[in-house]
């Protein structure tokens, strides 16, 4: 089998890769294959599912790993992100102390308020994804050399990927603005990130993939990855 073109290899070697497309086109299968390929080449890979029904675990033939990364195969870690789990982890990163998190975020009224904030779930899950790209081992090397994100279906993927830049541009200076800027910078990195698109050879999936490609270039300023026609 011939090796892939250099531009394809370069995209598949990027540190932060997002796989997106219309629901039912095989997006999760492609994300799992990309992550498995990298892990078999010796990379330390984290595969993140965004609030999904453990499809990555099913494709890989392993047990689900909700909220916390777990090594499921050699060099391959899996984590299904949920809004509640991402909120807890992100809050603990800020508050540092679990007792303080429990006092504030487990309060019934606070929990109700948080549920009422539009798109907060997407922002905290993007924050969790960004955080995992910054983790290091004791020797200072990256804990994960690849982070592959199985994004939600097209409309939700647009929100998931665009929200950090929107928040960074509109909120006043403070902790939230700094965090959103870091998330947006990761998505917009011309060398570290890319967006892979998956479609079926049918009109609606292809149109949604093209729409997402245009949105990525004009709104997200995110590099294009590879296109997969299942």
What are these regions (language model features)?
Residues 3-9, 25, 29-33, 40-41, ...:
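Conserved catalytic-core segment of NTP-binding enzymes
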Residues 12:
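Residues immediately N-terminal to the Walker A/P-loop in ABC ATPase nucleotide-binding domains
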Residues 22:
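P-loop (Walker A) phosphate-binding loop of NTP-binding proteins
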Residues 36-106:
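N-terminal phosphate/diphosphate-binding loop that engages ATP/GTP or pyrophosphate donors
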Residues 84, 112-121, 167-175:
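Flexible beta-alpha connector loops of hexameric P-loop NTPases
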Residues 92-133:
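ATP-hydrolysis module of ASCE/P-loop NTPase motor domains
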């Amino acid at each position: 089998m011939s090796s892939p073109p250099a531009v394809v290899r370069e995209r598949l070697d990027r540190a932060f890769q997002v796989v997106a497309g219309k629901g039912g086109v095989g997006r999760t299968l492609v994300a799992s294959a990309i992550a498995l390929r990298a892990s078999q080449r010796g990379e330390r890979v984290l595969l993140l599912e965004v609030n999904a029904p453990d499809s990555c675990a099913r494709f890989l033939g392993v047990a689900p790993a909700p909220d916390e990364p777990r090594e499921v195969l050699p060099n391959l870690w899996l984590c299904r992100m949920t809004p509640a789990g991402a909120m807890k982890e992100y809050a603990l990163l800020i508050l540092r102390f679990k007792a303080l998190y429990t006092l504030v975020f487990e309060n019934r009224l606070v929990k109700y308020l948080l549920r009422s904030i539009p798109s907060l779930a997407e922002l905290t899950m993007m924050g969790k994804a960004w955080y995992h790209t910054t983790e290091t081992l004791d020797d200072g090397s990256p804990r994960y050399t690849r982070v592959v994100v199985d994004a939600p279906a097209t409309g939700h993927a647009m929100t998931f990927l665009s929200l950090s830049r929107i928040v960074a541009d509109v909120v006043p200076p403070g902790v939230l603005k700094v965090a959103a800027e870091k998330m947006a910078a990761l998505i917009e990195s011309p060398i570290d990130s890319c967006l892979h698109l998956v479609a079926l050879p049918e009109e609606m999936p292809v149109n949604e993939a093209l729409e997402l490609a245009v949105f990525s270039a004009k709104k997200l300023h995110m590099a294009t990855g590879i296109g997969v026609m299942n």
